[in-house]
C-alpha cells in the first residue's frame, strides 16, 4: 500500500501544473495529504475555532510542517468577532463550514488561486453515504464527490478513496506529526455515531455498501446531469419565477435545494423544500415571503425573480416595511 500511494502521488505531482490551496487541520488525514501533495501546494489554510483543548496544538503542528517545508501558511483565528458575523446560524457545524469556506475564498483571491485540496477520505465517503441512506435522502449522489465547486472554489479531494487508517499509517511510517481530535470519540454528533458503526464493518460489508453506492449513483447520474443543466439555466436567468413555475415538482425540488445551498443556507430539510414548493406554487403574491432560516426569507421580488430578504423580528416594523401574519414561517411585506 505504501508503494502504491507513493507511485500515485508521484504521478499526480508530475502531471499537475496547477498550484493549490490546501485545507489542513493538523489531523492525520490532512497532514498525510499535505506531505503527499506539497509540491503542488502553494498556500496552506488552517482554521482554529478554539473549541477544543487541542486546537492550539494542532495549529502548531501545521505551522511547524510549513516552516520545515517552506510553505506559505494562512491562519484564521476564529474569535468572538468572527462568530458574531455568523450569529444568525444556530448549528455549529454549519457555522464552522461557512466560516472556513469564506476564508478559503478570501485566501484564494489574495493569491489568485481557484483550486483547493481537502483531505476527505474513504471513511468520510462511506459515512456521508450511510447518513444519506439512513435519512432516505433525495440526494442524486450518495457520498462525496472527488471534485466540485463550493463558494466559487474548485475543490479537489485527492485522498478520497484512501482509508483513514491507511493515511494515519502513512504519517507514522513517514514520521509526520499529527493531532487526534478528541471529540471524534464523543457521541455528540451524528457523524461520530456513524463512524463507530462503519469502523466495526468487515471488509465484505464495506465492499457491499460501496457496491450499493456506486449502483445508486449510476442510476441517478442522467437525472443529476439534467438537474445541473436546469439549475445553470435558472441561475443564468437570475432565478426567474416564470422559469421555476414551469418545471415539474421534482425539478422544482432540486432548483430550490441548489438555490439555498448557493446562498449559504446549508442542509435545508426536505420538509422545508416541499413547503417552499407549495408556497411558490400558489398564485404569485409579492407581498409574502417564506422563512428559510432565522431572519432569512425567500420570496418573489418586484422583478418577478426569486430572491432572499433579511428580516429580524426585533427590527422596528415601520422601518423594515414588514408585517407579521399568522403563519410563523411567513411574513407579509
UniProtKB/Swiss-Prot annotation:
Tell me if Chloroplast is a UniProt keyword of this record: no
This enzyme catalyses: cytidine(34) in tRNA(Ile2) + L-lysine + ATP = lysidine(34) in tRNA(Ile2) + AMP + diphosphate + H(+)
Q: Which residues bind ATP?
A: 25-30
GO terms under biological process:
tRNA modification
Its subcellular locations are:
Cytoplasm
Q: Which GO terms describe its cellular component?
A: cytoplasm
Q: Which HAMAP family match?
A: tRNA_Ile_lys_synt
Its annotated function is as follows: Ligates lysine onto the cytidine present at position 34 of the AUA codon-specific tRNA(Ile) that contains the anticodon CAU, in an ATP-dependent manner. Cytidine is converted to lysidine, thus changing the amino acid specificity of the tRNA from methionine to isoleucine.
Q: What is this protein called?
A: tRNA(Ile)-lysidine synthase
**Species the sequence originates in:** Ureaplasma parvum serovar 3 (strain ATCC 700970)
Amino acid at each position: 500500500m505504501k508503494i502504491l500511494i507513493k507511485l500515485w502521488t508521484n504521478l499526480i505531482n508530475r502531471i499537475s501544473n496547477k498550484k493549490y490551496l490546501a485545507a489542513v487541520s493538523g489531523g492525520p488525514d490532512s497532514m498525510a495529504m499535505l506531505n503527499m501533495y506539497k509540491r503542488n501546494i502553494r498556500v496552506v489554510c488552517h482554521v482554529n475555532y478554539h473549541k477544543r483543548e487541542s486546537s492550539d496544538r494542532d495549529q502548531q503542528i501545521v505551522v511547524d510542517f510549513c516552516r520545515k517545508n517552506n510553505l506559505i501558511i494562512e491562519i484564521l483565528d476564529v474569535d468572538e468577532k468572527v462568530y458574531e458575523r455568523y450569529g444568525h446560524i444556530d448549528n455549529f457545524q454549519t457555522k464552522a463550514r461557512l466560516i472556513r469556506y469564506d476564508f478559503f475564498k478570501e485566501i484564494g483571491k489574495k493569491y489568485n488561486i481557484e483550486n483547493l485540496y481537502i483531505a476527505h477520505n474513504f471513511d468520510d465517503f462511506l459515512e456521508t453515504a450511510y447518513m444519506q441512506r439512513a435519512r432516505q435522502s433525495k440526494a442524486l449522489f450518495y457520498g462525496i464527490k472527488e471534485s466540485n465547486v463550493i463558494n466559487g472554489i474548485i475543490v479537489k479531494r485527492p485522498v478520497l478513496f484512501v482509508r483513514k487508517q491507511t493515511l494515519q499509517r502513512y504519517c507514522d511510517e513517514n514520521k509526520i506529526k499529527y493531532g487526534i481530535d478528541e471529540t471524534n470519540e464523543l457521541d455528540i454528533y451524528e457523524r461520530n455515531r456513524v463512524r463507530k458503526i462503519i469502523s466495526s464493518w468487515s471488509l465484505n460489508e464495506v465492499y457491499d455498501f460501496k457496491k450499493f453506492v456506486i449502483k445508486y449513483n449510476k442510476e441517478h447520474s442522467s437525472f443529476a446531469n439534467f438537474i445541473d443543466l436546469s439549475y445553470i439555466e435558472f441561475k443564468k436567468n437570475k432565478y426567474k419565477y416564470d422559469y421555476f413555475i414551469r418545471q415539474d415538482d421534482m425539478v422544482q425540488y432540486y432548483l430550490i435545494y441548489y438555490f439555498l445551498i448557493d446562498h449559504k443556507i446549508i442542509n435545508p430539510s426536505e420538509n422545508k423544500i416541499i413547503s417552499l414548493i407549495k408556497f411558490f406554487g400558489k398564485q404569485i403574491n409579492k407581498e409574502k415571503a417564506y422563512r428559510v432560516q432565522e431572519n432569512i426569507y425567500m420570496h418573489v421580488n418586484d422583478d418577478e425573480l426569486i430572491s432572499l430578504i433579511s428580516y429580524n423580528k426585533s427590527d422596528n416594523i415601520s422601518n423594515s416595511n414588514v408585517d407579521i401574519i399568522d403563519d410563523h414561517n411567513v411574513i407579509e411585506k
